[in-house]
């Protein structure tokens, strides 16, 4: 199972270190990949959002299950997320997770998404969102495989 996370913006060094940390642990469960998509700096906010959404859409793995991380999404427990991931794994589905830029995503992407999740009612930087998503994927696989996941 391939898990691609595509995020708008350049990630800080400490975030990249965290990504390496989780990628190392995740490799026994899946093939993780984080793609940094260059931010758009020119144009109106609407034009920026449209172009960034288009750039994210172009990074969707063919035939994959598309998840969008957005504050309007559904909040689930780690156990519920593990059940969801297990179902996708059993179906042999790859996953593409999309994380928008500071202005968010346009509505087109929500029509392409199979599921929209929110991590919290709080707001996180895009880099922190990537780390939290990777941690939750790792936690989900530990739950799926009956391994201890409390550290």
UniProtKB/Swiss-Prot annotation:
A GO molecular-function descriptor: rRNA (pseudouridine-N3-)-methyltransferase activity
S-adenosyl-L-methionine found in the keyword field: yes
UniProt xrefs under Pfam families: SPOUT_MTase (PF02590)
Coiled-coil region(s): none
Annotated EC: 2.1.1.177
Keyword annotations of the record: Cytoplasm, Methyltransferase, rRNA processing, S-adenosyl-L-methionine, Transferase
Binding site for S-adenosyl-L-methionine: 100, 119-124
Domain of life: Bacteria
Gene3D superfamilies per record: 3.40.1280.10
Location in or out of the cell: Cytoplasm
Catalytic reactions on record: pseudouridine(1915) in 23S rRNA + S-adenosyl-L-methionine = N(3)-methylpseudouridine(1915) in 23S rRNA + S-adenosyl-L-homocysteine + H(+)
GO cellular component, one term: cytoplasm
Keyword S-adenosyl-L-methionine annotated: yes
InterPro entries associated with the record: Alpha/beta_knot_MTases (IPR029028), RlmH-like (IPR003742), tRNA_m1G_MTases_N (IPR029026)
Family membership: Belongs to the RNA methyltransferase RlmH family.
Binding partners and assembly: Homodimer.
Described function: Specifically methylates the pseudouridine at position 1915 (m3Psi1915) in 23S rRNA.
Name of this chain's protein: Ribosomal RNA large subunit methyltransferase H
